[in-house]
Amino acid sequence: MSKILSFWFTFLLLAGAAQGQIPTTFFGMGVAVTTDPPKVNYGTLSHPAVAWTSIEGTARGTYSFKAIDAFVKLAPKDANGVALIDLVFGWTPGWAVADQTTCFHNKNGTVSCTAPPDNIQDWVDFITAVVNHYNGVTAPHVKYYEIWNEMSNTKFWTGTPAQMVALAQAAYPIIKQDPYALVVTPSVVWKSGVNYMTEFLQGGGYLYSDLLSFHGYPSQTGGGQPVPVPMPESPLSTNAPIMTMITTFRGIADTNGMLNKPIVTTEGGWGTNGVSDPDMQAAWITHYEILQAGLAATNNLQFQTWYTWGYVQSGTIETSTGDPTPAGLAYNVVLTWLAGFTPSPCTLSGNIYICQVAFGKQIVWDTSQTCSDGACTTEPYSVSTAYTKYEDITGLKAPIKSGVVNLGIKPLLLVK
């Protein structure tokens, strides 16, 4: 990333944002390993390795914070030195479960299980140890604690909503002893998560939650699902368009005890090998960021997360040499379009998405266009003569001639 972009982003992070404006903390980034820190800008570090087995995996009462400490150290810090990280719990250690039928062995020799602990005191002791460790002295305070990863996914949880409420109820008063900490609901995936989150909140989970978390994957990948996946706004998404996910979980929160409390996308993207063409990846990630930013104010979406940085299969925006892909570079550029402004919800006019960022700034793209093998289609698009220049997602700036731009699937920022 350029030194100018990095300096600008750091300045905004420290300065904060006025009410209603998109803060830099809105842009969350997952990280695969701490030895490969993101070379893109981000304001919140989201979704490190699930923490219970990582910290207390070997034996009851034996804690090793080394792995999670590395993520906390990597996270941006606010003016109070609080680590802006979503620390996620999940997978019960094997020693805490007598029935091992839901358990599996990890490469490091520990055992993880999807069942709840037999004795909730083990959970209480673990949460207490974590909060005591991240106390601002031995280690930085942590901003967000997510109770469990994907409680609606049997790969992570095979207990009931009521059992998850019990874990949240036990953890909440301990975590809230830290005045800087916020408790995030267990995350859910679409579509099973709609009902599961509703049951969790109606069962009392709303009493022990400061924010509602969901994972924003518009389309499924793997298991024979078609690729490339549709664009994140597409009605052909095999899960749901990202806008539908946001408004749905906003409604679930508001009608089940969390009226006006923030919601967060703690993980999301095109998924495992969902998009392979570099130009379409750049278009996809920028649509994803812009659409969510447009709904931030009206839905109290506090932050959203791209999963993930790292040379891995899911949402890959890093090259084999450790640099940002064209999608990663485009992500950086679009952050400069959005941070510090108050975007309105994007609207669709024919094939054209129109996203008003601020007075004199508008983002547009044409959903009917595409890219393949280094070539992208465009169509002439007439703009108001008030707009005199544009910027593309590579950062290239140019004057608008005769009130017309060549518009494709990649967004353009129009500027008066």
Give residue spans per PLM region.
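Bacterial N-terminal signal peptides
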Residues: 6-15
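Boundary/entry segment of secreted carbohydrate-active catalytic domains
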Residues: 21-51
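Substrate-binding cleft and catalytic face of glycoside hydrolase catalytic domains
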Residues: 40-209, 213-234
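Conserved, mostly hydrophobic/aromatic
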Residues: 75, 130, 145, 171, ...
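Aromatic-lined carbohydrate-recognition surfaces of secreted/lumenal glycan-active proteins
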Residues: 141-145, 168-197, 244, 250, ...
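Aromatic/acidic polysaccharide-binding cleft in carbohydrate-active enzymes
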Residues: 265-338, 345-351
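Carbohydrate-binding surface patches
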Residues: 347-385, 410
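C-terminal beta-strand-rich structural cap/linker in extracellular carbohydrate-active enzymes
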Residues: 397-416
